[in-house]
Amino acid sequence: MVVGDVTTGTDVLVIGAGPGGYVAAIRAGQLDLDVTLVERDAYGGACLNRGCIPSKALITGSKLAHDAGNAEDLGIHANPAVDLSQMMNWKDGVVDGLTGGVEKLCKANGVNLVEGTAEFSGEDS
């Protein structure tokens, strides 16, 4: 984590690695700009880490269990039991894989990653 002023120059400074931030940073890197991306939490933002993706992963697992238990018309006889701890671990693996992918894409496109918080200050910011 960086505490204090960052005095090194950069062409583009992006604050926040959510879906807008990391895409902007990657594109700037593809354009051969010197780009720095500052993120205080995990890459991907709220949707990837705490919202859309984890929710959909759990819904998918729950639907699979439900469908397996209601498929007797197809000749499938099952009484699935959900191990919530294992399902949560699977969901965490899905999220970790995607956040890791965002980080790798950033690095592959020359984005300098900084863990911390940032703000613009001064008359010209």
Where are the regions that the model predicts?
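Beta1/beta-strand and adjacent pyrophosphate-binding region of the FAD-binding site
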Residues: 4-20
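Glycine-rich flavin
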Residues: 2-4, 8-9, 26-33, 38-125
